Design a protein with these regions (language model features):
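N-terminal leader or domain-start segments enriched in small/polar residues
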Residues: 1-40, 53-58
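Short, basic/hydrophobic alpha-helical segments
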Residues: 39-47
Length: 90
């Protein structure tokens, strides 16, 4: 079995401006939990990539999984700066 068959082995750093949230996100996270997620990403970095698919027509990525990590990168100035505005994506 070749390990390059699974997307997890091909993490890419994508500018957050090229990522679009999908229209459907059933999860609602309360502000205290979002603050904890922001703190966790600040202290430990991104430990899981977000899942996206590439839309060739629009030349952007549509977010499938990882909406709250995406939101943290977009809204936390310190994390955005440290990560150079790049989100880990498979």
């Amino acid at each position: 079995m070749s390990v390059d068959k699974s997307p997890v082995y091909n993490v890419k750093a994508i500018p957050v401006e090229k990522i679009q949230a999908n229209d459907y996100n059933p999860n609602v996270v309360a502000p205290p939990e979002m603050k904890l997620l922001e703190l966790s990403i600040w202290e430990d970095g991104f430990t899981m990539p977000c899942v996206c698919y590439y839309d060739q027509e629009k030349d952007n990525y549509i977010l499938v999984d990882g909406y709250h990590r995406y939101q943290v990168l977009k809204t936390s100035k310190r994390i955005y700066q440290r990560e150079n505005g790049l989100l880990p994506v498979v």
